[in-house]
């Protein structure tokens, strides 16, 4: 962290920038990372990795043969910038970006609800 405060840039998605500042080059607000594509919501189920969280989202799929809806889930690794600092149990919004690693192509852009508030 530097001494002076850098203004967070607008990422074009209508989300409020975080109050904290970071020096992460892969932060969409304070770094050089561009976001584009899908915007998803889910719950953080793991935050044990460094600057990475696993976001789980549930969705429903219709099975025509049995005429029923089945509940499915997907687990998406996402980059967690230090200025956002999402923790396990938080409801977050993630946005697609360029591939950051072999499995990470999403970044956390907003914490919708903290775990202790739920």
Curated annotation (Swiss-Prot):
PROSITE patterns: RIBOSOMAL_S17. One of its GO terms (cellular component) is cytosolic small ribosomal subunit. GO terms for molecular function: rRNA binding; structural constituent of ribosome. It comes from the Archaea. Transmembrane segments: none annotated. The keyword RNA-binding applies. GO terms for biological process: translation. It holds the Pfam family Ribosomal_S17. Keywords: Ribonucleoprotein, Ribosomal protein, RNA-binding, rRNA-binding. Belongs to the universal ribosomal protein uS17 family. PANTHER family: 40S RIBOSOMAL PROTEIN S11 FAMILY MEMBER, 40S RIBOSOMAL PROTEIN S11-RELATED. One of the primary rRNA binding proteins, it binds specifically to the 5'-end of 16S ribosomal RNA. HAMAP family: Ribosomal_uS17_A (MF_01345_A). Part of the 30S ribosomal subunit. This is Small ribosomal subunit protein uS17. It comes from Methanopyrus kandleri (strain AV19 / DSM 6324 / JCM 9639 / NBRC 100938). The lineage of its organism: Archaea, Methanobacteriati, Methanobacteriota, Methanomada group, Methanopyri.
